[in-house]
Amino acid sequence: MANEVQDLLSPRKGGHPPAVKAGGMRISKKQEIGTLERHTKKTGFEKTSAIANVAKIQTLDALNDALEKLNYKFPATVHMAHQKPTPALEKVVPLKRIYIIQQPRKC
């Protein structure tokens, strides 16, 4: 048990613990410090995104006001003249053929 504590406190080559062998492959251990850094970065990111969201909401409100004014100035008939006409008949898409190729089994 004392050896385990000394192993944890002793400096490692390359600044990381040695790899663990599992299933015939060497797997590196994840460091706990790296996970702590990720959590701190996310909290800072949330604060900046909240500020950005407020700015986006304000710009969307301004755009909505401008669109309402345009809708009042130009009636719906003018907008309908510039829209793409709807087709009278729907296009029928032919079904794709499924080609089954007979191949011998791989043994």
From Swiss-Prot:
Which stretches are transmembrane? none
Cite a single GO MF annotation.
Answer: translation repressor activity
Per its UniProt record, what InterPro entries does this chain match? DAP1/DAPL1
Q: Which domain of life is it from?
A: Eukaryota
Q: What is this protein called?
A: Death-associated protein-like 1
GO terms of biological process kind: apoptotic signaling pathway; cell differentiation; cell population proliferation; gene expression; negative regulation of autophagy; negative regulation of CD8-positive, alpha-beta T cell activation; ribosome hibernation
Q: In which tissues is it expressed?
A: Expressed in hair follicle (at protein level).
What is the annotated role of this protein in its UniProt record?
May play a role in the early stages of epithelial differentiation or in apoptosis.
Mind telling me which Pfam families this protein's record contains? DAP
Cellular-component GO terms for this entry: nucleus
Region entry Disordered, spans: 1-23
What is the taxonomic lineage of the source species?
Answer: Eukaryota, Metazoa, Chordata, Craniata, Vertebrata
Key words, A-Z = Apoptosis, Differentiation
